[in-house]
């Protein structure tokens, strides 16, 4: 069911293309920013194997998404390889989001044998001191590097994720250098979102909107260098930055102020993946130029649009609840009571998010709203309203009015 926004902009077919599944809350680390508020042991409310396999059946019947198995720490589940292999055999592209510390040579082989296409490993600093302070356990940095090397030795596609906060923001260039030296296929950065444990450290650790904007411009510059796939994840503003920078480049080159064409914001490349709650994955097609996923930041068809929560992305909790994304704690449905297809097609939360005409404040009147949408999770964290304006955007829209909204489509609950 396609929705239409208040400006007459169709939000595409809204197929579920990226599904992030928190298969357990159990984890061996104590990350101070943890979205999941993970526990030392697997939760008794983690879905049992039979029900988990049934959810995979529902997903495969409803769509053909990339399925990211995350946590907590997904390797805490004794049946994780059974789930990965089952999903792979159902035709789903499976990725694994792990902290890397449990990836021995044997585990790395089991990951590959289960059909996992890419593994993401989080590095929240360029050295052990910085990373381990964020992850809460001494030795986590060295163990993560060991796990990464074990995966690379088998030819596995590996992605590094970095959560940006005050304690490590200055190390971003060093983390990029480290990712390149380790042979990582991708580096994804995330701005800290105040959810879960992140609420307690937000005031101390979140960078300012101005610093955030500076980082996105730095990221654009680095994306032109090639050699590694780069994505600013949970950073919808990046699409505006790219548009503005490309326009400035055209003007500087004497091309004139011709408007840079917008990519179709509803398009999601079939092998590209963005964020989960806390761990992002991207699968890059073979033969695509290195650096920016589609060769140049102006060619964003593989990058899709900004915030994808509820439009092409959703998140499944360890108990089976469905959310727009892992950072937006607003329940759209419950797989213990409803089928996935029904939730995806009929959730009122999802339909509200698919209609950019519902956006409020400066997001509602911004010329980039269909491209960016603002981070709905940060809006919710700041105001309790996931349709309010993005609090970490420095851009001032050219207009100051809001666009009219259209009625909710029939059949939406």
Predicted regions span which residues?
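Flexible loop residues that form catalytic
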Residues: 39, 72, 100, 124, ...
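Regular, well-ordered alpha-helical segments
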Residues: 36, 153, 375-377
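Radical SAM enzyme [4Fe-4S]-AdoMet core and its adjacent flexible, acidic
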Residues: 1, 42, 47, 113-114, ...
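Structural motif corresponding to alpha-helix initiation and N-cap regions
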Residues: 49, 53, 77, 104-105, ...
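Accessory C-terminal segments flanking Radical SAM cores
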Residues: 235-399
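Short Fe-S-cluster ligation motifs
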Residues: 54, 58-71, 354, 390-413
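Conserved alpha-helical substructure of the radical SAM core
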Residues: 1-118
